[in-house]
Curated annotation (Swiss-Prot):
The keyword Phosphoprotein does not apply. NCBIfam families: transpos_IS91 (NF033538). GO terms for biological process: DNA transposition. One of its GO terms (molecular function) is DNA binding. Transmembrane segments: none annotated. It comes from Sinorhizobium fredii (strain NBRC 101917 / NGR234). It comes from the Bacteria. This is Putative transposase y4qJ. Signal peptide: none annotated. Belongs to the transposase 32 family.
């Protein structure tokens, strides 16, 4: 069903051309994202015509852009990802741990996205695995996945990782499952201190290797002593690592995680209106009791904030570690189930790839085949047409 409210695409279509003309320093990736969202589900990308085999009702369906930054193109990808993860759930506690970069580091990250976001993943993974392996804490090999978000509710740059961690892991010899204490994963202060040290070590090494670049108000940091002075107060500051209460059970993990995995900077349902060159959107003010508020910004400022969160092309924002790492996941999960006394899941049946509409209905519970007019007939494709201008040259769906 088509939305009746404002969408990010509406803002880009009305004001995007002027914004691009005024901001010539936009990256190729940012321009491609804007174009993809503007053309999404329009005649420019082509589509098909369907007709009901009972009442003759017709509808035109335009193709989507499939870009991972597009608010309209995430539902099927999210549903497919969650379905894939469902078979991997273990009968144990699950914890949600968030690692956040300080504002001063976030400024460096914005000018060096691929490198610094990669260091965020690396330092987080090393921190969790090191503390979990320490016999003073858990003494086990754990597994987890991490999801990168780069925004806060106000759409400003706020890079942080959401980590979902089963509450336990293998003993050093791999013969036992060592469970966390009920309701407690690992000490947050210990995690925070190690995370701070590891991240700063990796960042300094990157600087020494000539891998960091600084521009505009950070240009002075290209000089070694200035860079070290910039980092000095961060060595003593408290870095935010937040462990949320454990999930009620494995199934609740998927319900919760589904809110995070394929989220974009702002969803269309948070937009209130677009009037007189201004955008109003809903946001939650976490600093004042999670109060729901409405923020008004100019269309230029809205576009600027949205584009802050365009990821480098090919950058993986969901990553897996430990016994959930891609290489040995099936083997390690089988070992987990055995140690936890879980039944062996039935092997999936080999079958031909399903047609898009079948996959959509299976994963979302909503039918694209049923006629929306008579609710009796099936919608049959009677014509396929190409795009008017052709699709964007590059889709980033990673």
């Amino acid at each position: 069903m088509a939305r009746s409210g404002p969408e990010v695409a509406d803002i880009f279509r009305r004001y995007g051309e002027a914004y691009r003309a005024q901001h010539t320093s936009l990256s190729t990736a940012q321009r491609r994202v804007m174009t993809a969202i503007e053309l999404c589900r329009t005649a420019a990308l082509g589509g098909h015509v369907e007709a009901c085999d009972q009442c003759g009702h017709r509808r035109i369906a335009f193709n989507s852009c499939r870009d991972r930054h597009c608010p309209r193109c995430q539902s099927l990808a999210r549903a497919q990802w969650l379905e894939d993860r469902r078979a991997e759930l273990l009968e144990t506690q699950y914890f949600h741990v968030v690692f956040t970069l300080p504002e001063a580091i976030a400024a460096i990250a914005y000018q060096n996205k691929a490198l610094v976001y990669g260091l965020l993943f690396r330092a987080t993974a090393e921190t969790l695995r090191t503390i979990a392996a320490d016999p003073r804490h858990l003494g086990a090999e754990i597994g987890f996945f991490a999801v990168l978000h780069t925004w806060g509710q106000n759409l400003l740059h706020h890079p942080h990782l959401h980590c979902v961690v089963p509450g336990g892991g293998f003993s050093p010899d791999g013969t036992q499952w060592i469970a966390c204490k009920p309701g407690f994963f690992l000490p947050v202060r210990v995690l925070s201190r190690l995370f701070r040290r590891l991240f700063l070590e990796h960042l300094e090494k990157a600087f020494d290797g000539g891998k960091l670049q600084f521009f505009s108000d950070l240009r002075a940091l290209n000089e070694r002593n200035a860079f070290r002075r910039y980092l000095a107060p961060l060595r003593k500051a408290e870095w935010v690592v937040f462990a949320k209460p454990p999930f009620a059970g494995p199934e609740q993990v998927l319900d919760y995680v589904g809110r995070y995995t394929h989220r974009v900077a702002i969803s269309n349902n948070r937009l209130v209106d677009i009037e007189d060159g201004a955008v109003r959107f809903r946001w939650k003010d976490y600093r004042h009791g999670d109060r729901q508020k409405v923020m008004t910004v100019s269309t230029d400022e809205f576009i600027r904030r949205f584009l802050l969160h365009v990821l480098p092309e090919g950058f993986h924002r969901i990553r897996y570690y430990g016994f959930l790492g891609n290489r040995y996941r099936e083997q390690k999960l089988a070992q987990c189930r055995d140690l936890l006394g879980m039944s062996v899941p039935a092997p999936s049946e080999t079958q031909a790839p399903k047609e898009y509409r079948d996959r959509y209905e299976e994963l979302t519970g909503r039918s694209l085949r049923q006629c929306p007019a008579c609710h009796q007939g099936q919608m049959i494709t009677i014509e396929i047409f190409d795009g008017v201008t052709g699709p964007p040259r590059c889709w980033d769906t990673s």
